[in-house]
């Protein structure tokens, strides 16, 4: 990876969400009329991508909240499930108007990468389909993306509110802050919650980042590549909710994969560990 570039800032006036999306706030009654299917000639403004692995307990709520956001924005959109489930998740998704794709490989990162190949929107949202993220926050994140002319917006759990039972104390007070610190030290990312799974970014940003990893380190890779390429990342505080359904992650294994990936790819790798020790 190359040396991180400096991200520039601008003071010029940016258009508001209503200027870019005139129908924003109208609340369309027939939201299904705004949903774009995979064969439609209509190009969606927004692609909402959710990786799913046996999420039948929460997928309906996630899709409904995403549809509420689409209705508020009043723009053509697609909801994409990148699904490897053995339960009723894909059937529920299709019934509610989502496009379901089945990745040909396993892995959190690969599920996203596979779906991104099929996503056609100008703006792309990614979020876990376990009810921990509120997809009705999409208009708020999109507003920040447009008004700040940023390339990516992260929903920050650590700057927002983490509801009781939604995140283990070890993750809240040690794991996530420490992993974020690593990224900020190595890549000057300047973020508070580098591993939030709720993000929105432009198509141009995705093409610049061009992620390659297949596992949980995918979340780190996106921030690393965005920083290296000088993309503007901004954050919006969000509420992190308790999940529906069984946990599918291995905390220690996935955390170590993040750390190892950051160390192996950090500028000045031989000096990475001493650098982190001095910075903490």
Give the location of each predicted region.
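A conserved acidic beta->alpha catalytic loop
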Residues: 81-90
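A conserved hydrophobic helix/loop-capping motif in glycosyltransferases and polysaccharide synthases
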Residues: 46-55, 62, 82
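Hydrophobic helical membrane-anchoring modules
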Residues: 1-43, 188, 211-280
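Donor nucleotide-sugar binding loop of glycosyltransferases
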Residues: 55-58, 85, 108, 134
């Amino acid at each position: 990876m190359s040396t991180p570039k400096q991200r520039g800032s601008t003071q010029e006036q940016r258009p508001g969400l209503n200027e870019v999306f005139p129908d924003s706030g109208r609340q369309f009654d027939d939201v299904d009329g705004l949903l774009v299917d995979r064969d439609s000639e209509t190009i969606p403004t927004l692609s909402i991508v959710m990786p799913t692995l046996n999420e039948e307990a929460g997928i309906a709520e996630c899709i409904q909240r995403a549809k509420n956001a689409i209705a508020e924005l009043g723009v053509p959109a697609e909801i994409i499930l990148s699904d490897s489930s053995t339960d009723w998740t894909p059937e529920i998704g299709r019934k509610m108007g989502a496009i379901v794709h089945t990745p040909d490989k396993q892995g959190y990162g690969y599920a996203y990468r596979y779906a991104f190949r099929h996503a056609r929107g100008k703006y792309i949202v990614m979020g876990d389909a376990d009810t921990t993220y509120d997809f009705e926050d999409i208009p708020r994140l999109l507003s920040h993306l447009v008004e700040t002319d940023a390339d990516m917006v992260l929903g920050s759990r650590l700057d927002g509110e983490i509801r009781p039972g939604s995140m283990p104390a070890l993750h809240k007070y040690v794991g996530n802050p420490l992993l974020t610190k690593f990224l900020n030290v190595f890549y000057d990312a300047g973020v508070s919650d580098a591993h939030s799974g709720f993000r929105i970014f432009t198509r141009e940003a995705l093409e610049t980042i061009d992620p390659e990893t297949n596992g949980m380190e995918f979340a780190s890779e996106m921030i690393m590549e965005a920083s290296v390429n000088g993309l503007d990342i901004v954050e919006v505080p969000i509420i992190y909710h308790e999940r529906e359904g069984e946990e599918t992650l291995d905390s220690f294994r996935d955390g170590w994969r993040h750390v190892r990936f950051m160390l192996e790819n950090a500028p000045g790798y031989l000096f990475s560990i001493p650098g982190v020790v001095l910075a903490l």
